[in-house]
Each structure stands twice: as C-alpha cells, then as structure tokens.
Amino acid sequence: MKIKKRQYLIIPAMGFIFVGAMACSPATDQFSARSAAKGIPAGWSTGGLGMAGVDYDWIARFKDPQLMALVAEAMKRNPDLKATAERVRRAEAVARLSGAEKKPQLNAQVNSLQQKQRFPGFPIKLGSNNAEAYGASLDVNWEPDLWGRLRASQAAAAAESMAFAEDYRSARASLAGQLAKAWFALGEAAEQVILAEAAVGVRVKTVASVQERFAAALEGGLASQLRLAETDLASSRASLALWESERARAIRQLELLIGRFPEGNIPEPHRLPGAPSVPPAGLPSELLKRRPDIIAAERRYEAAGLRRGAARAARYPSFSLTGRSGTSTSAFEDVLDRGFGIWSLAGSVAQPLFAGGRLKEEERIAGHDEVIALQELQGTILRAFAEVEQALVAEEFYARREAAVLESATSARKAAEASILDFADGAVDALTLLAAQDRQVQTAFQLVSLRRMRLENRINLHLALGGDFQTQVLP
C-alpha cells in the first residue's frame, strides 16, 4: 500500500510542476521594424514628388508589351530565382520539422529472443535450458514544452521561413529591375546605332564637299580642314562600332537574365520609351511595410530574439513522459493475444547541472546574434530611406537636365542644318561646318543616354519604394 500512496503523490506533484512551469514560460517579445527605426520623418524631403498611394504593377507603367513578356519569361526561367524559390521551400520544411519536436513520438516495435543456457561443472549432467520470448509494443515518448523552448524554436524557424519568402520577393524585384535596365540599355544602343549611322552618312558627304572645295582651291589652308573632316568621319565610324558592340552585349545580357542560351536572338526595341509619371511614394513610415528586404530583416530579428529565448529555456529543467503498451509471450502465435499484455508509464525530470559552460555561452551567443540582427535591421531601414530620397532627388535633376539637353540638341540640329547651307554658299568655312555637325552629334548622343539614365533612375525609384508587379507565382 505504501507503493500506491507514493504513486498517488508523484502524479499530482508532476502536474503541479507542469502547471507551474507553464506559468513561468517566458513571453515572446514583439520585434518590429517600427520599434527598431529611430526618427522616421513625416515626409520625404522632395515634398511634392512623394505622392500618396501604393506603387502597383510598375512594369506596366512603361507601356511596353515586349518588356512585360520578357519579365514574365524571366520569372519562370531564371535559374538564380528558381534557387531562391527552393530556399523558401526548404525554410518552410525546416519550420515544419521544428514543429514536429513538440508532438509525441510513437514507435512500433517487434522483438524476438531465443536463448540457450548450459550448466557445465555439475556432477550430474543437467543438459541445457532453452527459452524463447516474443513481443510487440507501441512506444510513446513526449517532452512537454515546459519553458517554451520548443515553441520558441518553432516560432524562430517560422520567422526565418517568412524571411526567406521576403528574400524571394526581393530577388524577384531585383531581377525585374535588372532586366528592365538591360532592356533600356538595348534600346539606347539601338538608337545610338541609328544616330551613329546617320553621323557617318553626314560626315561622308562633308568630307566629299570639303574635298571638292580643296581640289578647286577655293580657299587657302583647306588641307588641314580636309584632314579634320576625315578625322571626324573616322571618329563617327568608331562610335558606330562601339554602339554595335554595346547592342550585342545588351542582347546577351538580356538572354542571360531571362535564362536563355546567349545566342543574340532577341528583337530589339525601336526606341526608348518616354519616362512615365512619377510613382506614388507614400509616407516614409509606410515603406517599412512594403520593402521586402526590411520585412526580411525584421523577421530575422524576430527569429534571433526567439532563439535567445530558446537558449535561455534550455538551461531550465526538462520533463519527459514515456509509455509502452504491448505483449510479451514465449509463443510467437500469442504475440497479438491481449491476454499476454504489458504496459508501463514513466516520467522524469532532468536539470542541467554542469555542461562546461556550454549552455551559458550558447545563451550569450544567441544574445549577440539578436543585437547583430537588430543592427542589420536598422541599417536596412536607413539604406531604404536613402535609396528613396536619392531616387526622388535624382528624378528632379534628370527632368531638368533632359529639358535643357533637349533644347540644346534642337538648337544644335538647326545650327548644323544652317551651316551646311552656309558652307555651300561659301558664307562659312569648313571649321564652322565641322564644329556645328560635331555639336549636333554629341548632343543627340547625350540626349539618348540621358533618357536611358532617367529610365534607370525610375526603375531604382520603383524598387526603392517596394513597388510590386504581376506574375508573382513561385517558379
């Protein structure tokens, strides 16, 4: 009877320990980018450029069906993006695996034992003793999560999984941005090739005109002017070769980003599109909820804090329950007979006493990891704000520069056209003609490059704002 009384005392005591331990389980801290960010301004420094709203489907803003088709193809074929998607799936599997540790473990077991024992050394021959034993059982093992260690580990794995999902969003946006920039670089090269071909044609005619006047000895000192005209022609041919090379390079860069074999088989755009309207920038505080890199850093900060809690809980006592139910018999045919049934139930409490300082240092390391994650989150937030501010300010300057260069290019074109007529009439010398033509060529090249740079800055602004676009399914 004493044994029974002790059993009745042990069970309530373990229940008391379990309930008390659950009450002592540490609460999980809330980790957010807003709490990590310091001194978020009420608005952007550019004022009017930062309109309210959300930047949806920024690829469609360029109104280029071919670009949209290439982006959609890249989302399906790019191997780097596929690898990032697999990392997301792997992180999700790790999170599910971490959750499995909280559940009871059930194992089926079948055993067989055959034993033979001899009795040597006796005055009479006793022979030997043969014994057989068979059994089947179901074993259950469960470790109740007294201090929240397993719960914190599972939550940390889930937060890490969400961070990888945001990494995928970030990689997806980055790929779209790189592809759009490569597409516009191809558009610039195509336009520059056309301009270079036109410049070669014009300068061939100029060389012929100067050569004609030189042969007729209409002016003194035309030999040097003829050489200058020939120099400009050679320079234009070099520019043409350069831009043809840039066009081929841009095509292969596009194919690489898409995931195609780089064979130079992409139809090039006829010209660069105009810059669309400035996207809505919203409020700086809203950026914390849109940028995938900020959200990923936020989730990693959360995971680090949860792992710190799990490391702290690992220093507390652990409680485990084991149970077995089955049969044990000397005859194999009786293995499934309940009349030979056995069962057992055991509980244990273990308190780490000495581990060479390992548990303490693991908690310290987890604390350092949490501080590192916080600093990385704050750095990500600052970089995000800087990228938006820089893109908004650059947009203002690019708009002013494009207007000024457009005016300059228009004036240079008119001056070159007038100088051709004046040169034919003998009103100006070849130097004036060559200078006017060179100014026209250079301003035309500059205008195309500036338009491409403005489009690239617009892409940077879309990415900095955490803008989204279509075709969001994992490849």
Predicted features and spans:
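Terminal intrinsically disordered/low-complexity segments used for targeting and assembly
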Residues: M1-K76, Y134, A158, A241-K289, ...
